[in-house]
Amino acid sequence: MNIAEFHQNIEQVWQKIEEELENQGADVDCETQGSVFTITFDNRTQIVINKQEPLLELWIASKLGGFHFAFKNGDWVSNDGQRFWDCFVEACAAHGENVQF
């Protein structure tokens, strides 16, 4: 994957998150600043998702900790094989919002 494809893939992830959270009625605010996408929950906790361009990775930080994902076979996957979307759903639940992706 080249840099342009990387950014396009990340933008698609961020757009899907924002659209699905809105469609599912989640009480959150989403904000993008440069390479950082922040989701603030009603209880004022946050999930931060950011682009790591030099590594071509997607990173997520939440109450559950920090996780790194690389794009493999059409999906964002961590070194231990966890899918980004599964991690994101678990993180949202830890922050008080039950969502499905």
From Swiss-Prot:
Entry keyword annotation includes RNA-binding: no
Function recorded in the entry: Involved in iron-sulfur (Fe-S) cluster assembly. May act as a regulator of Fe-S biogenesis.
Listed transmembrane segments: none
Organism domain of life: Bacteria
Family annotation (SMART domains): Frataxin_Cyay (SM01219)
Family membership: Belongs to the frataxin family.
Protein name from the UniProt record: Iron-sulfur cluster assembly protein CyaY
Protein species of origin: Haemophilus influenzae (strain ATCC 51907 / DSM 11121 / KW20 / Rd)
GO molecular function: ferric iron binding; ferrous iron binding
Record keywords, A-Z: Iron, Metal-binding
GO biological process: iron-sulfur cluster assembly
Pfam families to which the protein is assigned, alphabetical: Frataxin_Cyay
GO cellular component, one term: cytosol
NCBIfam families referenced in this protein's UniProt entry, alphabetically: FeS_CyaY
